[in-house]
């Protein structure tokens, strides 16, 4: 099937092969060991414990479905703005070909504030997880639509062995069953179908009955207004990953505060 996700995964495999030739595992391990870690899960739980929305604020220049979201794109400034206006964590796109992201953007955003940072990319190999640790990420994303269950479990175990938090992302009930076999407390429900890029926030609401109370539900994509936030919080969904709404605003941090606080 030649859909968007399959094309992205094919490119990832080519990128991994090239990266492994230029930066062998042992070199990456040395870089990773020199990096400190910030508590991604703890930051989300702290916001929730205080009765606030736990916002993972995204640093994203573009997307395949929407094109360029922000022309004036300075990751350090965006990160500082998010931190000043109540974000719990950051998410930074590192995919170059499809999202115009960069490893450098993650490094710049993390250096500009004290928030924990998620590497937002399409991870299909353990090498990318070590790469994430070496670049300074505190958490990684695993996308159920791109992985079978045994591989997802192996990748999670490797991430945890490096001290990284794992956000597992699903879009339907079958993927949620797959995700619930993992140990991570972070369950992301993507309201956007990665194969068609169609979006509905009802996707999150329709899966809440499957989720044990000890897990943290993170609703992702399509959260564009205070009304969307209120709808989710009324359903006891209190963690959010938001990018587009902030990136399109003149002041991303101020838009975060307007929508959530």
Swiss-Prot record:
Pathway: Amino-acid biosynthesis; L-tryptophan biosynthesis; L-tryptophan from chorismate: step 4/5
Gene3D superfamilies: Aldolase class I
InterPro entries documented for this protein: Aldolase_TIM (IPR013785), Indole-3-glycerol_P_synth (IPR045186), Indole-3-glycerol_P_synth_dom (IPR013798), Indole-3-GlycerolPSynthase_CS (IPR001468), RibuloseP-bd_barrel (IPR011060)
Catalytic activity: 1-(2-carboxyphenylamino)-1-deoxy-D-ribulose 5-phosphate + H(+) = (1S,2R)-1-C-(indol-3-yl)glycerol 3-phosphate + CO2 + H2O
Any GO BP annotation: L-tryptophan biosynthetic process
Enzyme superclass (EC): lyase
Record's keyword terms, sorted: Amino-acid biosynthesis, Aromatic amino acid biosynthesis, Decarboxylase, Lyase, Tryptophan biosynthesis
Molecular function GO labels: indole-3-glycerol-phosphate synthase activity; phosphoribosylanthranilate isomerase activity
KW Lyase (keyword) present: yes
Enzyme Commission number(s) from the entry: 4.1.1.48
UniProt family annotation: Belongs to the TrpC family.
HAMAP family recorded: IGPS_B (MF_00134_B)
Protein name, entry field: Indole-3-glycerol phosphate synthase
Record organism: Burkholderia ambifaria (strain ATCC BAA-244 / DSM 16087 / CCUG 44356 / LMG 19182 / AMMD)
